């Protein structure tokens, strides 16, 4: 859909099509176990080059409601999980690479302002009838979208 909102499955598809792919969809089952609980805020930290981007591409493809990704996941480990169908393609996904914002700004305040502006613009493109013109609060924009769609957000940073 957008740059950040519901990014689809292209990134994960590229990983699947690579000469070397290791199925890490077991991570999805771990996330599914907490997605509807108070423990839903998860931090997966790893050193550089440990596959964080591939993991976020995979999670975005799995949860993104704007595209049916059954064809990508049906043959992978996650398809055997009890929760596979329940959560697949059921959320609005915001996927963000914070390094993108850090590299284009000179201060934390500027970075946060640019980040918020870009996220709101993407929400407005995706849901023009639900995000008010001139909205400058990301939290309110997301609440407005949720109030109309009842589709929860998964945020991947």
Predicted region positions:
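Phosphate-binding site recognition
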Residues: 1-157
């Amino acid at each position: 859909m957008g740059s950040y909102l519901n990014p689809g499955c292209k990134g994960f598809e590229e990983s699947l099509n690579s000469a070397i792919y290791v199925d890490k969809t077991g991570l999805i089952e771990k996330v599914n176990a907490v997605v509807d609980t108070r423990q839903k805020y998860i931090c997966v930290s790893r050193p550089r080059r440990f596959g964080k981007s591939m993991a976020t591409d995979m999670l975005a493809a799995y949860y993104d409601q704007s595209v049916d990704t059954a064809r990508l996941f049906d043959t992978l480990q996650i398809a055997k999980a009890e929760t596979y169908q329940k959560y697949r393609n059921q959320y609005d996904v915001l996927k963000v690479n914070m390094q993108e914002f850090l590299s284009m700004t000179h201060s934390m305040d500027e970075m946060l302002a640019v980040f918020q502006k870009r996220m709101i613009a993407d929400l407005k493109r995706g849901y023009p009838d639900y995000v008010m013109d001139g909205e400058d609060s990301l939290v309110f924009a997301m609440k407005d979208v949720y109030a109309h769609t009842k589709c929860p957000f998964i945020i991947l940073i």
